[in-house]
Swiss-Prot record:
GO molecular function term, any single one: nickel cation binding
Self-association and partners: Heterohexamer of 3 UreA (alpha) and 3 UreB (beta) subunits.
Localization, UniProt: Cytoplasm
Primary location class: cytoplasm
EC number(s) from the headed UniProt entry: 3.5.1.5
Alphabetical UniProt keywords: Cytoplasm, Hydrolase
Entry annotated with the keyword Cell membrane: no
Name of the featured protein: Urease subunit alpha
Lineage top rank: taxon: Bacteria
Region (Urease beta): 91-213
Organism of this sequence: Helicobacter mustelae
Length: 213
């Protein structure tokens, strides 16, 4: 234990963040050595054990793992058990896998004006549209007023989608694309900035390729 503690101490002095085993070994060694001197009480050593390491001295998550350190140490008058609860002060950082949730609900796409549009699937297979797909360029078997939906996407959470079953009609909400509003790819109807000039080109391409009849 003493050797492991000394090794951990040297690593700490070099700026190496300690792992779980090293942290426990260093705290235990410090308590053990001060107990041997006979100048401190059990209460003193419990306090000392919480001063050996800080959260920045250990690897992420170690402070949360070390709930307590218990060690039987030799005092001049015999062996006593020293227990140190939460020996490594947490600096408020997130623990691995931890979630911190807000008390209030999160408003999706807050501040963005949404419009509603009725969409019908005229095909014989389901059609699924992702959150950031340029709705103007969706499958040509989806029937809706495409011209007025240029530069818009679904008003749903990022990474989710809406599924249109064969023959189904449903109303969805659309919002303008954010950011720089540069749209590329999809069905190759618009490749560039969302503006009136590119809208005219996109409409012409949509009519030529059968997206608008």
């Amino acid at each position: 234990l003493h050797y492991a503690g000394e090794l951990a101490k040297k690593r700490k002095e070099r700026g190496v963040k300690l792992n779980y085993v090293e942290a426990v070994a260093l705290i235990s060694m410090e308590i053990m050595e001060h107990a041997r001197e006979g100048k401190k009480t059990v209460a003193d050593l419990m306090s000392l054990g919480r001063q050996v390491l800080k959260a920045e001295d250990v690897m992420d998550g170690v402070a949360a793992l070390v709930h307590e350190v218990q060690i039987e140490v030799c005092f001049p008058d015999g062996t006593l058990l020293v227990t140190v609860h939460n020996p490594i002060e947490n600096n408020g950082k997130l623990h691995p896998g931890e979630f911190i949730l807000k008390d209030e609900d999160i408003v999706l796409n807050a501040g963005k004006e949404a419009i509603e549009v009725k969409v019908s699937n005229k095909g014989d297979r389901p059609i699924q549209v992702g959150s950031h797909f340029h709705f103007f360029e969706t499958n040509k078997l989806l029937e809706f007023d495409r011209e007025k939906r240029y530069g818009r996407r679904l008003d749903i959470a990022s990474g989710t989608s809406v599924r249109f079953e064969p023959g189904e009609s449903k109303t969805v909400r659309l919002i303008q694309f954010g950011g720089n509003q540069r749209i590329f790819g999809f069905n190759d109807l618009n490749n560039g900035q969302v503006n009136e000039d590119n809208k005219r080109k996109a409409l012409a391409a949509a009519k030529a390729k059968g997206f608008i009849k």
